Amino acid sequence: ARSIMREVQEGVSAFVEGLRFNIGLGVGDQVALMTFGGARFILVDWTGDLEQLKEGATKLRSRPATGAFLPDAVNDIAKDFAEREAARPVLVVVATDGIDYGSHHDYRRIVQDLRASYTLMYSVFIPTASRRLTLNWDSRERDALLSEGPRQTGGRRINLSGSQPVRDALISIQNELASQYVVTYHRPESPVPPQRLSLGVTRPNLTVRLTPRKPQ
């Protein structure tokens, strides 16, 4: 049988290892590892120590006696980023379709807070056989956040299917993070300032997403 938690552990470990070689954490760059089955729990607090993060990944466990509070956890992270004045905040959420017991926050407001803190959000969704039994209203709110958070911040949602490994999804996210470009431009003088900017690419089958850069 498929062990989802083992896959998540291996995927997060590979993601952390890739931070060393693919992205290269700079001085002051920090990563945290948190779970949200029930109240948010910090496995590894903000750190630049990748070995500590890899060890934390091995401690990821399912918490079957609790319900998920994903919207509240994402809301807390958005506040953390704002308070820390993070220069390049990125949030990667890995979630299954277990029961979500509700939230005190509307997903639309959470997405606004993510955008206000210039957070780039990705989500990896792992379906299970119990999905048809858990589509309550709160789960719909969670699903909306998993979709709209990435869409409105420049990330993307990855829905795993069949035996697709969690590791592959996380590595693909990491490759995108390592392939970002800063676009600068100068607009011509005009009595009416333009409201939109269009960016085109010539390479076929290439998708470009925008994440507004935090003002310096």
Set out the residue ranges of the language-model regions.
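Scaffold/interface architecture of coatomer-like assemblies
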Residues: 1-216
